[in-house]
Amino acid sequence: MAGILSKTLSEVHPSLRTNGMGIGNTHRRISLGFLPPNKKNPLVRKFRARTRNIDQRSFRSLTDDFGSNVHEPNPYLGNIDEEPDLYYHDEEDGELSRTISLPSRVSETPELSPQDVDWILHEHERRYSSVCNSDNEEASQSNTPDRIQEYSGRELEYDEFMNRLQAQKQKLTRSAVTDAKGTSHHRRPSFVSVTSRGSVPTIYQEIDENDSEALAELAHSHVTFKSEARVLASYSFPLIFTFLLEQIFPMVCSLTVGHLGKNELAAVSLASMTSNITLAIFEGIATSLDTLCPQAYGSGRFYSVGVHLQRCIAFSLVIYIPFAVMWWYSEPLLSYIIPEKELINLTSRFLRVLILGAPAYIFFENLKRFLQAQGIFDAGIYVLTICAPLNVLVSYTLVWNKYIGVGFIGAAIAVVLNFWLMFFLLLFYALYIDGRKCWGGFSRKAFTHWNDLGHLAFSGIIMLEAEELSYELLTLFSAYYGVSYLAAQSAVSTMAALLYMIPFAIGISTSTRIANFIGAKRTDFAHISSQVGLSFSFIAGFINCCILVFGRNLIANIYSKDPEVIKLIAQVLPLVGIVQNFDSLNAVAGSCLRGQGMQSLGSIVNLMAYYLFGIPLALILSWFFDMKLYGLWIGIGSAMLLIGLVEAYYVLFPDWDKIMTYAEILKETEDDEVDSDEYLTDSDDPDENTALLGA
């Protein structure tokens, strides 16, 4: 009998001996004899708890136990071709099945939950972690000339399989909420068996239409330079208009107050500079979502996108508290810098009102990135198209209306109202139009892993503040040469900041795509997206340069009526146009680094280039060589060129292994944050209430 059995097994096809559930499995070799009970196996433990009879184990097929939809058509991986079962018939008509499974009563277990799917994720991660044969089998099969490599592209199929299982887990979470309300639902979808050929199994025949579209998008098939250029263009244009509309708000504030007097205008300018520097900190914190949210979305962990949003908002609000205190007591702080008491008083009053609007700005910036991670880039246009004209109307009414106008402080109130209106309109869009898919409800996880978030946020703050402060320093240095030079520098800086929004929008779009691809483990497509983004940066820089060079006289006359100021602006703008090419490369390359999760590298490059090279060079050229505004812009432009070249090198020649490892660390950190009652125990207590497929 033993000889016949041995001879029969030796004639079995190699694919049946290497990837099946039983025979020849290199990870778990199950004896064909009677299986002893494994008390640590959660399936056996659950079965014992339900039946109280350890002798009811079965050798029925896993296909029969777990699947009723085995032979239904598969819309994702195609039909699974099942090979006929191989049986050995002895004299008593016994049979030897090629698959061995657990009791058929397992299929009668309660409805699946997200914890159930967690167990399946861990089990498949272990079971499919390798597709290689054992050493002995590999050596014995290496001599077969017609051996076919059956595992090409297996890793990509496995990644897609895991993404789909993650998506189904989130669907079950939504179903659990519906079930809690007493709503009936259909019988749970079943699993398809693992075939002898080792192909990735089809899971959950019933999938949400929205999830299906998302999973199809995650496949990222047929990505080429041309197709990616179309995608980035469709993402970038809405963002360009969004950022340009955002730049209108401070201009409206200055124009509205400017006619009240020079002290009021100076106070608004000083308060705007202070608030811009402060709010740039929270925008830098929000840039961490450029890494976290798109990567989570690309890997199919949709609800993690919402958790990252909550965590970043909570983190930002805590950081905002000391800055709010500083704004409230800004009057004594400003007295050490500015001697005019009236100017200090007006600035302090303006900042105290802005305290109420800063939280809304934080909400808006984070929610905007939450939507961008899902590929929703046009929401900002709709919101700002409504807010921009309303802001003009409200500002004029609160400042100049003889019935309800409150004068200077009305401009600050208008800014606060505008911030809150922007946030509520964007929230309405996310709730009722598009973007709610990644929201799984409020979670206590928002108050965990702040240390990991802080590393990304700190680097993002340095990247933004380094450039923001460098522009402010140029304005301060220009005041040394007189009022005309200060006015010219202010106009040129404002125009440069406005045009900077074009490459910045391209960079945000590119970083989102890169992070999506990294989350989907498609580094080849992420590299294509990086190349397209950098190519677009040269186009944007050239367009900005042409605008400043050929429109220099028109721009100068818009900003001033003073002949000397007009002349200075017209002379400096061509140089600033050349610098825009470097700044455009800098903007896109820095955004690509954020998409890769390499903010720390970008922060180091920005700090060293600006403050160890650019600013000192600007001071030397402007003061010692008497080049004045030319020297300032040559110095800062040289720093931008250096930053752009260094960052572009690391974008085009990245260490993908390091990037993917870091992305996996972020993913595992998020996945490890579960409640203690969701973990399996090794207890043999028959009365335990361990879930069948616990996480």
UniProtKB/Swiss-Prot annotation:
| Residues that bear Phosphoserine | S113
GO process annotations (BP): xenobiotic detoxification by transmembrane export across the plasma membrane
UniProt membrane topology term: Multi-pass membrane protein
Q: Enumerate the residue ranges of region (Disordered).
A: 673-695
GO MF terms here are: antiporter activity; transmembrane transporter activity; xenobiotic transmembrane transporter activity
Task: Indicate yes or no for the key word Membrane.
Answer: yes
The miscellaneous remark of the record is: Present with 195 molecules/cell in log phase SD medium.
Annotated protein name in UniProt: Uncharacterized transporter YDR338C
Q: Which domain of life is it from?
A: Eukaryota
The record's section on Pfam families has: MatE
Q: Which UniProt keywords apply?
A: Membrane, Phosphoprotein, Transmembrane, Transmembrane helix, Transport
Q: Which family does it belong to?
A: Belongs to the multi antimicrobial extrusion (MATE) (TC 2.A.66.1) family.
Subcellular locations according to the entry: Membrane
Question: What NCBIfam families does this protein's entry cite?
Answer: matE
Bilayer-crossing residues are 237-257, 265-285, 313-333, 344-364, 380-400, 408-428, 457-477, 488-508, 531-551, 565-585, 604-624, 633-653
What residue spans carry the Acidic residues bias annotation? 673-688
GO CC terms for this protein?
Answer: membrane
